[in-house]
Amino acid sequence: MKKITLLLLFLTNLLFSQQAYYNGIDFTLTGEDLYNALQQRISNYNQNFTYGDARDVLVFTDENPSNPNNVLLVYGYNDTDGNCTTDRSRDKLDFGGLSCEYNREHVFARTLPVPDMGNVNNSTTGIGADPNNLRASDQQMNNNRGSKLFQNGSGTAGDVGSGNWYPGDEWKGDVARMVMYMYTRYGDRCLPGLVGVGNLQGTTQMLQTFLEWNATDPVTSYEDQRNNFLQGAYLNRNPFIDNPALATVIWGGPQAEDRWGILSTQDISATSFVIYPNPSVNSEISITSTATIDAVVFYDINGKIVLDLIQPTKSNNTIYIANLPQGFYLVKISSENKSITKKVLVN
C-alpha cells in the first residue's frame, strides 16, 4: 500500500466564529431534523437588543463595501438617475423619515406574521427589533413596498402581479435568506406563505420562489459582513447566509451553493469506502476502497479546507495528518463524478 505523508500547518489567524457557533450541530441531518437543530441554535440571542440598537448598527452592518461612508439600500438600483427613491447607496448620516433619507425596512413586514409584530419604537425588543430582518432602505422605497407580499419577477424592484412586490434581481437572494431565517427562528409565526406568493415546495411550508431566489442569487460579501457583525451584537447568525445549501437539505428545490463543500447529495454507497481508525490514532487515517479515488478533501467544522488531495494514488491510501487540532472533520471522497462525506474525529 502506497503511503502519502502530509504535514498540515494550522493557520492561527483563521476566524473561528462560525466554527464555534455551529459546533455540535450534526450536519448529516436532513429535512425537519436539521431545521429543528438550527432553530434551537439561532433562538439564543441578545434579549436586550432594541429597535434603537438596530438603527445604530445599520452603519456597520449595511456599510457599502465600495464606499465606507455610505450604506447600501435594499431594493435600490440606481444612484445616477436623479431620483433618490431608487438610490442603491446613501450617506450614513442621512438617516431619518424625510425625502431622500433612509430608515429601517422590515423585510418580513411587521403586519404579516401571525400574530403580527405590533408597533415598534426605539425601546422595542424581540421580533420587531431582530436585526436579521432589518435593512437600510430609502424611506419612500420602504413606503412603496409597505406590506406587499413578495412575488417572482425580473429586473429592478417594484410592483408585480396584483399588488405584490419584486425585490429586484440584486436583492432577491438576500430577501429569500432573510425569510428563511425568520421562518427558522420564529416557526409558524413567520410562515413563508405569509410574506410571499407562489407554490409550496412539496409537503414543506417553504415557497418554491424563495428556494429559487436563494439558489440563483448567491451570497455576497455584504451579507457576510452583516452576519459577522450581528453575531457579535445580536449573538446569533443567519445560517442560510453561511451556507445556502442548508435550504436545499431542509426543504429541497434547486441545489443552492454549498459554501462549505460538504452538503452535496451523497450518491456513493457508504459501504464503498472505509475510513479507519475513527477516532484516529496518532492522527493517522486510512481510506480503503475498491473504487478509484479521484479526490479527498478534509474540512474543519467551519467549512474550511484543511487538506485537499487530487488523484491520491490508486484506490487504497493511507493519509497521515500531523499538527491538526483535536476535533471533528468532514472528509469528502470523490469518485467518478460522485461523492460521499464522512465524519472523522482527530484525537
Regions found by a protein language model. Give the residues of each.
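Bacterial Sec-dependent N-terminal signal peptides
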Residues: 1-21, 265, 341
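Boundary/junction segments of secreted and surface-exposed precursor proteins
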Residues: 17-40
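Domain-level detector of nuclease and nuclease-like folds
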Residues: 96-103, 107-261
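Short hydrophobic "helix-edge" motifs at membrane interfaces and signal-peptide entry regions
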Residues: 4, 95-97, 233, 268-269
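C-terminal outer-membrane/trafficking sorting elements
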Residues: 268-347
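Betabetaalpha-Me/HNH-type nuclease active-site subdomain
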Residues: 38-148
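Low-complexity, Pro/Thr/Ser/Gly/Ala-rich linker/spacer regions in secreted
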Residues: 19, 254-271
